[in-house]
Regions:
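Terminal anchoring/processing modules of extracellular glycoproteins
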Residues: 1-116
Length: 116
């Protein structure tokens, strides 16, 4: 019984702390793991930080279409309850192709596209 009461108190505390967090729009960085060379495989990263609430949609795009084999890092947060997430996928830079990250969050009126 005491263990259940402690767990309930902890959940209430976490909920109250979460209520203090203001809605925050994400900050987005799109970059390659290493220096990009045309025709050489690399890893495209989309690092999204500073957002709240935690629900967010992040997609990597090649010429406007989703890139396959995307990996999602763990969702983590800081002391202000602002969240961050890394999304990445292998890609090969080629002339004429456009690589980007599309982010949709409740603080945005519509999804935003951030080009690499």
């Amino acid at each position: 019984m005491a263990r259940g009461a402690l767990a309930l108190r902890l959940l209430v505390l976490l909920a109250l702390l979460g209520l203090e967090a203001a809605d925050e729009a994400p900050k987005v960085e799109v970059y390659a793991r290493s220096r990009a060379e045309e025709g050489k495989e690399n890893t495209l990263h989309c690092f999204v930080t500073g957002f709240h609430p935690p629900k967010i949609d992040i997609e990597l795009l090649k010429n406007g279409e989703p890139i396959p084999d995307v990996k999602y890092g763990d969702l983590s947060f800081n002391e202000k309850w602002q969240f961050q997430r890394l999304v990445y996928a292998p890609f090969t830079p080629t002339r004429g192709d456009i690589f980007a990250c599309r982010v949709a969050h409740s603080t945005m009126t519509e999804p935003q596209i951030y080009r690499w």
